[in-house]
Amino acid sequence: MPRIGIIGGSGVYGVFEPKETVKVHTPYGRPSAPVEIGEIEGVEVAFIPRHGKHHEFPPHEVPYRANIWALKELGVERVIGITAVGSLREEYKPGDIVITDQFIDFTKKRDYTFYNGPRVAHVSMADPFCPEMRKIFYETAKELGFPVHEKGTYVCIEGPRFSTRAESFMFRQFAHIIGMTLVPEVNLARELGMCYVNIATVTDYDVWADKPVDAQEVLKVMAENNYKVQELLKKGIPKIPEERHCGCADVLKTMFV
């Protein structure tokens, strides 16, 4: 059984060779796509393309609960979430990697929990991301010579539209990067006692910067980011220990009413 799961985009296929496809039926419907099982550097992993095999799910329609539940059903204990983000700060440049340490939720109508009754849970999200995996991927990015930020606050918006300029100026007062897919993925993983790390890749500056978007430049940055993520996964995943020493699963002891 795979103990590591990856949720991301098509760039993962550059480093991941699927060996088996598993259709998982969950109480929350079907995942974005059948789960693909394969190996990265000899480590068995499970992969779900977040937006579907053909990018058919916009951010607000991704079946987040089904995705996380499916990975848990297959034995996954650690989830690596890969996201593309815009920058809210000058120093977070296109092409940079951010190992997110906090998030702010500005989504509006997603399925946020597995516990809608009769059982009720209040999960602690003070430190939402696995410290063990954050350290591994930050240090690996440094070793590879990639521009990386050890911390960053991710503001997650509903989408699929982008922010207005007024919203962007507001968000940059308290966050570093902006995207549409981190929530509720991260809190659902926490509710099931799973470790979660977010590897965010900066594609461009958000609208606050008032810089014209050059489509060719964005595509170039995205291709470079895919390469960096692939190298990070190749070098970082083998460093993840078999046993968890992070305490991420401890929340299960205190979250139920």
Swiss-Prot record:
UniProt-listed Pfam families: PNP_UDP_1
CDD domains assigned to the protein according to its UniProt record, in alphabetical order: MTAP_SsMTAPII_like_MTIP
Domain of life of the native organism: Archaea
First-tier enzyme category under EC: transferase
UniProt binding sites for substrate: 180, 204-206
UniProt keyword terms in alphabetical order: Glycosyltransferase, Purine salvage, Transferase
GO CC annotation, single: cytosol
EC number: 2.4.2.28
Binding site for phosphate: 10, 50-51, 83-84, 181
Mutant phenotype after disruption: Disruption of the gene results in a large decrease in ribose 1,5-bisphosphate generation from adenosine.
Molecular function per GO: S-methyl-5-thioadenosine phosphorylase activity
InterPro entries assigned to the protein according to its UniProt record, in alphabetical order: MTAP, Nucleoside_phosphorylase_d, Nucleoside_phosphorylase_sf, Purine_phosphorylase-2_CS
Catalytic reactions on record: S-methyl-5'-thioadenosine + phosphate = 5-(methylsulfanyl)-alpha-D-ribose 1-phosphate + adenine; adenosine + phosphate = alpha-D-ribose 1-phosphate + adenine
Pathway: Amino-acid biosynthesis; L-methionine biosynthesis via salvage pathway; S-methyl-5-thio-alpha-D-ribose 1-phosphate from S-methyl-5'-thioadenosine (phosphorylase route): step 1/1
UniProt site positions, description: Important for substrate specificity: 163, 215
Function: Catalyzes the reversible phosphorylation of S-methyl-5'-thioadenosine (MTA) to adenine and 5-methylthioribose-1-phosphate. Involved in the breakdown of MTA, a major by-product of polyamine biosynthesis. Responsible for the first step in the methionine salvage pathway after MTA has been generated from S-adenosylmethionine. Has broad substrate specificity with 6-aminopurine nucleosides as preferred substrates. Can also use adenosine as substrate to form ribose 1-phosphate.
Subunit (UniProt): Homohexamer. Dimer of a homotrimer.
Similarity section: Belongs to the PNP/MTAP phosphorylase family. MTAP subfamily.
Identification of the protein by name: S-methyl-5'-thioadenosine phosphorylase
Native organism: Thermococcus kodakarensis (strain ATCC BAA-918 / JCM 12380 / KOD1)
Taxonomy of the source species: Archaea, Methanobacteriati, Methanobacteriota, Thermococci, Thermococcales
